[in-house]
Amino acid sequence: MKDSSFLWYDKPASVWTQALPIGNGTLGGMIYGKVEEETVSLNHDELWTGHPKNTIRPGSLEAFQKARALALDGKLRESQDIIESDFMSTWSQAYLPLGDLVLTFDGSDRKSDYIRSLDLDTAIASVSYRQGKRIMRRELFASHPDKVIAVRLICENGKFDVTASLKCQLHHKVKSQSGLLVMSGEAPSEHNTNGQSDKQSYSKVDSERGMLFTCAVKADTDGKKHISGKGIEITGATVVTLYLTAETSFNGWQNNAFTNGKPHLEPCIERLSKNFDYEAVKSAHIADYRALYSRVELDIGSNGKDNIPTGKRLRNFKKDKNDIALYTLLFNFGRYLAISSSRPGSQPSTLQGIWNEKFCPPWHSNYTVNINTEMNYWPVLPCDMPEVNEPLIEMVRDLSVAGERTAKEMYGMHGFVAHHNVDIWRMTTPVGGCAVWAFWPMSPGWFCEHIFAHYEYTMDEKYLRETAYPIMKKSAEFYCDYLVEDKDGYLIAAPSTSPENNFVLNGSNCAVSQTTTMTMSIIRELFENCIKASDILGEDKEFAEILKDKLKNMLPFRIGKRGQLLEWYNEEKESEIHHRHCSMLYGLHPAHLITADGTPELADACRRSLEIRGDDGTGWSLGWKINFWARLRDGNHALKLFDQQLRFKASTGMNYSHGGGTYENLFDAHPPFQIDGNFGAVSGVCEMLLDCFDGKIYLLPALPDKWSDGSVRGLLAKGNIKVDMTWSGGKLTLYSLTGNGEAHIVYGGKETVHRLDGGTLTVEL
């Protein structure tokens, strides 16, 4: 159905958040669809500022030891002062724009019958319009198999002229070389700000210089062609096909990309020397994309809104929430973004996926790993795309090496550590500024939740043995050292913060506590998963026993006077009661330490915490809350949050606390744009339809009343079991399971055990 798989607009984009994204994990493009002068904003996943360097602050170990002693003594303000004055490091590096492909056409911008679209079923963007007798058509896509962005320009009933040129905000030169338009440049050596200022610098010292890059364009046409540094000029054409590719000199996080970089010009020239057949390139692209995208299909109904432009549908949704297919469209768009921004061999998806137009993007468009990067990958496994997870796993593997030195020199501890920001150079130290965001050594523990889940969904024991468990154990070793006894004999992780949130201490804000609920939840889940992995692999029993002993003595969850789950060590007054982070609820989601059935008292405390926090928030915060309410088995409240996420947002402003929604191109609005909210919504839909924990698969655990009739095909459950479901009148009518082994199915409070033999088992109710 086109109303759930097709974005279309009746005018060109005027701002970036109206443009349509394409990507192949490495190359990204944003298509405006302009008539007289088209712009395709370009990105390459490896193009960042900076170079490898040691960011460990001298004297930080002594500072940490002082801060820990002060926190345990209840001197929290003094502990925070030490952390901020003597422990913090420098800022992460920034993800950069590659440049713009500019297409300048003959004629004016007068047009009729204009349509700009993105087909989620094929991952192809299109533009079409009339100019007098001429019918102008464009197709654009980013091919993963051929590693190019392909642009097809067609004119019916006439001919056209076009000039293709390249622009760039970085230091660069453009020239004609080997029959191609070639742009080569250099990235800044440093982005040393907090992400809100336009400060980037170029060094002349080779060991400090930034990476090099090349972007090249090839043109095939039936018209006349002339190439110079100004561009590729084509006249008298009916068909033009452009193939664009790019490479950087990035050669791994440990190597200097200027002095020890990999080739970047030669691979581009070699790649474009191929005689491409456009239809073959297009067919290979569609087949490659559909191999991932077509694994899942959701149908919750349609109201025949496909004749209304997508932007108008989004605006109308505020008053008319009967456009039920808009939910499915956002679900499908999120899966499209995941495939387009993360592929085997690419870098992981950043705060903005792989799409960034700004020289100094918000928050550096980095990996913010106190929820945002993790949220990017929440829907990947339940939507049966484990391949898309690989870049994240590889980054965590890198961090497990890079963070060893940080753990040893900053904390005096074994294992490895990282904090709340990471970049392509695998920075693991805390950034500068305030402890409220910068002091958070918990990202490895959260990442280990992801890498163990990858095993649970795929059941790949070789992966668990060789990749996941060694990283998990190394992370657990750090937290074993981090734990210390409190005054009551409980093991706590001191000092600690709750990401980006403060409490009131003696009339002013304070972030540092003796420990926090999120910190303890992450450690508890990691230890439990390490014990599970040890049992599965039949090894490391001695270490598992150490973890079991520590779990017995760890500080438990606690409930406050308002019936809420406590966030900090003591019951504190929140500085910002409606704060965007709900970090104390980590045990509810993404972990399963708290469940509606297994720990009802704690689940009620989570519900009360959500009521106190309120429903509104930034875009990604709304996405997280969809997942929370689904875990609490309240599908109607989850859908209420989904409705809020579908609020239309204009392309201006920044808001740290509330006002999240969706831009016209369906990008999530923090605001500004952050892609995590898109992925949080997809994950929330999966949670409403399927939940898996303790060896059981829960079918339709939080189905909203509004989604009374529907079906879903291809969701992946833990145990590597594919699940199809059909429901009517809010009741499950049929389900199919494909996989091996026992499947413990729970529906309507009843558990049924099925034994699967690799085929498909179908059950009618």
Language model: regions and residue ranges:
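Aromatic-residue-lined binding/catalytic grooves and analogous aromatic/hydrophobic interfacial grooves
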Residues: 1-436, 451-455, 473-476, 490-491, ...
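Short, surface-exposed recognition loops and adjoining beta-strand edges that mediate ligand/DNA contacts
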Residues: 348-366, 485-500, 666, 699-711
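C-terminal catalytic domain of Rieske-type non-heme iron oxygenases
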Residues: 353, 357, 493, 501, ...
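Well-ordered alpha-helical segments within folded domains of soluble proteins
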Residues: 371-381, 441-452, 518-528, 583-592, ...
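Extended amphipathic alpha-helical segments enriched in small hydrophobics
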Residues: 461, 465-482, 524, 629-645
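Acidic/histidine-rich catalytic neighborhood
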Residues: 474-533
